[in-house]
Every structure is written in structure tokens, then in C-alpha cells.
């Protein structure tokens, strides 16, 4: 319910900061990789969506992102941006607490799969309830859909844009039990500062302890659907597990993926259920102590669920896929330095990408701070080799560095995604201090002038002299 509150550390942008933004570099070629990096947004505190949440319009021409002043759209061809849904004025009674201001802002859910709409919620201070809206990304026209009951949130919209899914606590929850509700706003070092809605992008201080506390609380929750026309709510399940990361299939409007939150080694995380409440299925069942699986996402064709699989935790690394039609399982192996917090892929699954991680992440990678491009290769099964129909099919990633992220503070997760034309990997970074959305071209740059080539960490340090400290 409070997943977006983590991104707030302020609520006003100073004019000198805006002036400084105009001097930030817009484009350069990374000296260490040979790939061109482009800063796509101008707003300090701007941020892309969480890695597995759709940000692109169905026509593939627009990408939605958030900034302190509201919801924006980026034209992918011209790289021009515009404000689509502004944040409302700060309420007079909001006080000095940035959380109070944040509560009344607009909060994105997802970009629709059927229409060029971005779905979002906004709190109605008069009715004292959250309301779901959608806005046309091109015209900005806003349509009010349905109101939510107390304690309820919506996390995803289905493929035909008829249903939302979310959770609510069955009882009022003490603040000390709800994950993140009583924690301080994050330090500005993350870059997710002036009111930007980064949501799951920011790794909070004390995250592990808070997750343990929330899991142990066993708070009764309801997973539900809500009809976006009538407001009718349908219960899918009651649970005292910590339910989160709901994500509808990109093609099947009746199919929902969700997870049991908590320390990964303590939960069976990845689940699938239908909108009639049937076929509640665990996607990955462990068979080793300390085996973990998580950060799940859909393939763009809706046939495969992909996820980070470590066998065991922090020692051996795979990107695993489960095909819902064939029930076949694929595992692409990677090296420690290639592991990433999040992964993503192209249509057709010909290329994958990852956002790397600093030495404080689970992989403890000594040289993992890169935006990576992965070329997948399935391994040949030798003639005569035993290959049961239930066996994992093995593959390997061949990695290519795209961006040197050594000056990025990984407490803000980059959350990579490919552009629809597969020509660019898009990510969020605070390398310049405040967060911005960047792109890096998949193809290497050519015909370069020497003045165009820079070390990304050295360039970033000119504008942000503070060196990042590893997460832990």
C-alpha cells in the first residue's frame, strides 16, 4: 500500500538546480565500452518505471516516466518530452513532512497494453480515498475510473484494461508492522529526491531488517480484482503471507503473476493465479537449502516467466525461464560479475540486458557495476546425453559492457529495459547526483570525434563529486 513512499526526500526543486541541469551533458560515448549514452530527461529526480512494469504505449512511440512535477511522456523518435499529468498543488495543510505532500500526488500504475493510456492513482482529500484514473498519453485527457476502499492499493492493470489488481490489509495495521511505513525518507544521495515517484527503485536503509519484521507480522491481506467500470471487487485469496509484485500477463487478461514477499531464502516467491481465483500455482519450487528465485518478469509474448535464480544464494547465477505453454524450463548461466539486480529482454528474446550491481549486493561482485548487454546461447545437448522432459535446458550469457556505472549509487536501482525497436537500453541513474533517465545505444558508436569520448565515471564526478558507497 505504501510502496511509493520510499522515494521521497524533498518536495521543492531549487532554481539553481534547474539551471545546473542545463549544463549537464546530453550525450557522450563511454570510453570503456564504445557505446553512446544519452540523457533523455531534464527533470532532476526524474525516473523510469520499475523494470517489469510496462512504460511504452502500444504503438511503441512513447515512453512514460515520472518526475517531481508529475507524469511525463518521452517521444522515442524525437527524444522530446512533455508533461502529461501534473501533480496537484501542495495542500495548505500538508505541513513540512514530504510524505504528506507525496500522499496527494499522482502515482503511476502502468501504461496500458490496449490504448495509449497511462493508469495512475490520486488521493481525493475530500472523499479521503484513492481513485484510479487513466490519461491519454498524447492528449493528456484524464478519465476518472473507480475509487478504492480504505487500505487498498492497485498495482497492475490487465491486458484488455478492464481489471485492476491489488491488495488490502483486512484490519488496520500498526505502523511498526507495515513495511517501510515508519522509516525515514531516504537521503538525497540516492538521487530520488524532489518528490519523484521511484517506488521500488530505491533500496532503503535497513531493508533486510524491515523485511524480516514485515514477514514475521503475518498481516492478514486480501488479493483482489476491481472492475474498472463498475468498481466491483472480487476476492482472489486471503492470506497471511506478504503478497506483492502483482503483474498481469501482457497478453492474457485473465492471468496474474504475484509473489510472496520477504527474504528470498525464507519464501516460495513466484506464483500465478487466474482472475477467477483458480489455478493458484507456484512457479519455482526449490530443492536446495538457500536456493533463491525472484525479480520475476514476463516475456513480451506472455509465454514465459523469467526470474533471477541463484543455486545457492550468492554462489551460482542464472536467469531462469518457465514456458507456460510447453512447461519447459531454461537456465542461462552467468558469471558473478555479470549478475544484475534486474534483467530484461527484447521481443523474440534475442537479446537480454542487466543493470549490474555494486559489491554490496547479493553477488558480492568485485567488478559488477555495468549496464550489460547479454547475447544468449543455448548449449548443445550431446548425442546420447540423458535429457528428460523435466530437465532444465542449459544456456549461457555472453556479456558486453554498455555503460560504466562505477559512479552510480546502487541504492537507486537502474531498472533496465529495451526500447521497442531494440536499439537502446533505457535506465535510471543518479551518477550526476539527482536521478535522470538515460539511454545507451545497443550498437557501438562509429566515426567518433575524440572530444565525444569520455570516461562515464570521470564525467559524472565533475557534476557529482561525492563517490557512491556500496549498499549492504
Please name every model-derived segment.
Residues 70-73, 127-133, 173-180, 213, ...:
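Structural motif
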Residues 46-64, 89-121, 149-169, 238-259, ...:
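Conserved beta-propeller blade repeats
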Residues 76-79, 136-140, 227-231, 274-278, ...:
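Short loop/turn segments that connect beta-strands within beta-propeller blades
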Residues 28-48, 395-405:
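A short helix->beta-strand "capping" segment at the edge of beta-propeller domains
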Residues 90-222, 231-238:
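Asp-box/WD-like beta-propeller blade repeats and closely related beta-sheet repeat scaffolds
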Residues 20-38, 212-224, 386-392:
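Blade/loop signatures of beta-propeller domains
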Residues 412-472:
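Blade-level signature of beta-propeller repeat domains, shared across WD40, Kelch, NHL, RCC1
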Amino acid at each position: 500500500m505504501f510502496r511509493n513512499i520510499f522515494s521521497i526526500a524533498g518536495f521543492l526543486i531549487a532554481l539553481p538546480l534547474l539551471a545546473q541541469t542545463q549544463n549537464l551533458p546530453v550525450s557522450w560515448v563511454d570510453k570503456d565500452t564504445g557505446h553512446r549514452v544519452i540523457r533523455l530527461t531534464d527533470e532532476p529526480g526524474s525516473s523510469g518505471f520499475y523494470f517489469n512494469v510496462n512504460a511504452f504505449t502500444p504503438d511503441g512511440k512513447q515512453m512514460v516516466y515520472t518526475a517531481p512535477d508529475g507524469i511525463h511522456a518521452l517521444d522515442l523518435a524525437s527524444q522530446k518530452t512533455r508533461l502529461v499529468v501534473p501533480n496537484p498543488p501542495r495542500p495548505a495543510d500538508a505541513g513540512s513532512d514530504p510524505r504528506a505532500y507525496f500522499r496527494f500526488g499522482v502515482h503511476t500504475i502502468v501504461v496500458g497494453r490496449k490504448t495509449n493510456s497511462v493508469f495512475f492513482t490520486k488521493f481525493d482529500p475530500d472523499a479521503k480515498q484513492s481513485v484510479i484514473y487513466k490519461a491519454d498519453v498524447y492528449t493528456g485527457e484524464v478519465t476518472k475510473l473507480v475509487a478504492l476502499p480504505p487500505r487498498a492499493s492497485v498495482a497492475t492493470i490487465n491486458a484488455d484494461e478492464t481489471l485492476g489488481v491489488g491488495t488490502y490489509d483486512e484490519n488496520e495495521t500498526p505502523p511498526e508492522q507495515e513495511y517501510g511505513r515508519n522509516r525515514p525518507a531516504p537521503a538525497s544521495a540516492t538521487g530520488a529526491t524532489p518528490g519523484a515517484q521511484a517506488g521500488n527503485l530505491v533500496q532503503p536503509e535497513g531493508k533486510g531488517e524491515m523485511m524480516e519484521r514485515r514477514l514475521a507480522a503475518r498481516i492478514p491481506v486480501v488479493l483482489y480484482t476491481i472492475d474498472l467500470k463498475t468498481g466491483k471487487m472480487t476476492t482472489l485469496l486471503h492470506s497471511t503471507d506478504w503478497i506483492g509484485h502483482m503483474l498481469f500477463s501482457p497478453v492474457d487478461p485473465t492471468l496474474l503473476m504475484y509473489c510472496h514477499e520477504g527474504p528470498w531464502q525464507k519464501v516460495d516467491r513466484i506464483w500465478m493465479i487466474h482472475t477467477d481465483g483458480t489455478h493458484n500455482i507456484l512457479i519455482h519450487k526449490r530443492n536446495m537449502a538457500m536456493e533463491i528465485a525472484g525479480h520475476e518478469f514476463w516475456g513480451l509474448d506472455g509465454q514465459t516467466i523469467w526470474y533471477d535464480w541463484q543455486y545457492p544464494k550468492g554462489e551460482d547465477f542464472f536467469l531462469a525461464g518457465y514456458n507456460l505453454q510447453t512447461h519447459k524450463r531454461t537456465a542461462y548461466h552467468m558469471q558473478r560479475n555479470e549478475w544484475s539486480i534486474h534483467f530484461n529482454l527484447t521481443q523474440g528474446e534475442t537479446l537480454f540486458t542487466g543493470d549490474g550491481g555494486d559489491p554490496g549486493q547479493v553477488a558480492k561482485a568485485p567488478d559488477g557495476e555495468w549496464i550489460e548487454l547479454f547475447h544468449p546461447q543455448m548449449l548443445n545437448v550431446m548425442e546420447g546425453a540423458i535429457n528428460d522432459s523435466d530437465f532444465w535446458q542449459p544456456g549461457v550469457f555472453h556479456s558486453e559492457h554498455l555503460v560504466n556505472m562505477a559512479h552510480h549509487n546502487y541504492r537507486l536501482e537502474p531498472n533496465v529495459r529495451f526500447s521497442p525497436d531494440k536499439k537502446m537500453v533505457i535506465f535510471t541513474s543518479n551518477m550526476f547526483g539527482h536521478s535522470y533517465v538515460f539511454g545507451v545505444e545497443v550498437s557501438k558508436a562509429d566515426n567518433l570525434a575524440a572530444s565525444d569520448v569520455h570516461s562515464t565515471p570521470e564525467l559524472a564526478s565533475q557534476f557529482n563529486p561525492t563517490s557512491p558507497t556500496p549498499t549492504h
